Amino acid sequence: MRTNILPGKTILLALSVVFVCLWFTVVSAQDNYEIQVYGSETVPRGVTMIELHNNFTAKGAKTTDDGTLPTNHAWHETIEITHGFNEWFETGFYIFTSARNGSGWDYVGSHIRPRFRIPPKWKWPVGVSLSQEIGWVRRQFSEDQWSWEIRPIVDKELGKWYLSFNPALERALSGPGKKRGFEFAPNFKVAYSVTKKVDAGLEYYGSLGPLSGFDPAREQTHQIFPAIDLNVSPKWEFNFGVGIGMTRSTDHLIFKMIVGRRFEFAKKKSQPTSSPE
């Protein structure tokens, strides 16, 4: 992602505008906790990234037959904390929450996500990394309480264009979904730098079913998100998108926003000064 520095007031203004736009769509707040196509770059050594994922399902499922809460008018807040340990390894931790009209906020569950990256010094023609995410959620939010995801990540910058492909594999470790084995859930992003500060593009999120045999088309989920990224500062991350469901099994309208901030807690080593002779 390209980063540029704007004055502090501009950063606050950009954040306020996006947040207010999303706030007025919110009535209450389920099933979409982290909607993001990953880039291959990991958080630098000694840096901690804190992200807030805000997702509101404006038009989703109003009923369910598995005892979980429906997604319609579900508002999700996810806190993601990621720390970089060296130039090729990071670990992320997620805290999922959900809110609905009349029920207040609920703790949903937590995941942990270690990720490895091909070091830049290898000079591969594309960026490559691999993440694994494992975690647990409460039964009222999913029949399959324990889950595991393997996510290969390949990306490339071509002039003003940016492409990223995440052919993720997901598996339930408990519950009725365990017998389905690994399921194919590809994500893809294409973006174009409209200016040095604004990237506009499309994000795709899908779930096709088990590798042993994909689900019928009507049971698959496919979503397209027109999205923008604001490159306001090397320390900040902003992403906003509106998701449109393309099948009957997909939530039909979702608003998402990601706000992230990088913190460098480790003190830089001071250079020794030579004493005059």
PLM regions: where:
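Generic hydrophobic-segment detector
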Residues: 4-6, 19, 29, 36
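Transmembrane beta-barrel domains of Gram-negative outer membranes and organellar outer membranes
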Residues: 29-277
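Bacterial N-terminal signal peptides
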Residues: 13-23
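Charged interaction patches that mediate protein-protein contacts
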Residues: 1-2, 96
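Low-complexity intrinsically disordered segments
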Residues: 7-8, 22, 32, 76
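Bacterial N-terminal signal peptides that target proteins for export
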Residues: 2-15
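Membrane-interface motif at the C-terminal end of an N-terminal transmembrane signal
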Residues: 24-28
